[in-house]
Amino acid sequence: IGAGCGSFTKNYYRSEIKNIVLTEKDQLNLKNLHNKFKKNLNIKISDLSIDKIDDKFDTILYLHVLEHIKEDIKELENAKEKLNNDGHLVIMVPAHQKIYGNLDKAVGHFRRYEKDFFKDNLLDLKLINLKYLDSMGYILYFLNKIFFRNETFPSKFKIFLWDKIFTPISTIVDFITNYKFGKCIVAVYKKR
């Protein structure tokens, strides 16, 4: 859901997956998705919302999408209805409302999330995994909010530093700290 430019799909695509449906509302992204995956016969691209799609799925992914949807609970209820029995719902969202700031507003986030939101009985789905990711990102995002309060988008230099230096460090720190804090929350559910 919310495939964006398709980078996740491109990086993790496997031809043995029989049916992949990418949904995207942004018309430019939709056009780019059609161009990028036109040779992949097992990928369907749609501008429909999850409740309008006829298929049922083994897995539904919301990777940095739910925070852009005003009625997030309703969206998840619709997704649950589209899951096959024993299907998985995977959600990745920005964590910690206390660090919500100008960057969040600028990119259309309605909110950031707390772990409590992803309680075990969310929509009567079984919680399989719940953890934070990107520990260094949390620290840097928090510092950025304090020292660059009015900044809406990070500079190219900050993005470079993040991608090349802090992301690899964050991966190690996440593991060492057993995913106890971070800039993002990942929740994995199974339909009972």
What would you call each of these model-derived segments?
Residues I1-G101, K119, A187-K190:
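Conserved SAM-binding loop
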Residues K38-L41, V107-F110, K145-R149:
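Short, hinge-like loop/turn segments at secondary-structure boundaries
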Residues F57, G101-K105, L140-K145:
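Short aromatic-enriched loop/helix-cap "lid" or pocket-rim segments at secondary-structure transitions
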Residues I69, R112, Y179-K180:
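Short, solvent-exposed loop/helix junctions and linker helices
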Residues P94, R111, N129:
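Localized chelating/binding microdomains
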Residues N102-F117, Y132-L133:
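Acceptor-substrate binding/catalytic loop of class I
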Residues K126-M136:
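Conserved S-adenosyl-L-methionine
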Residues D134-R192:
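A C-terminal cap/extension of S-adenosyl-L-methionine-dependent methyltransferases
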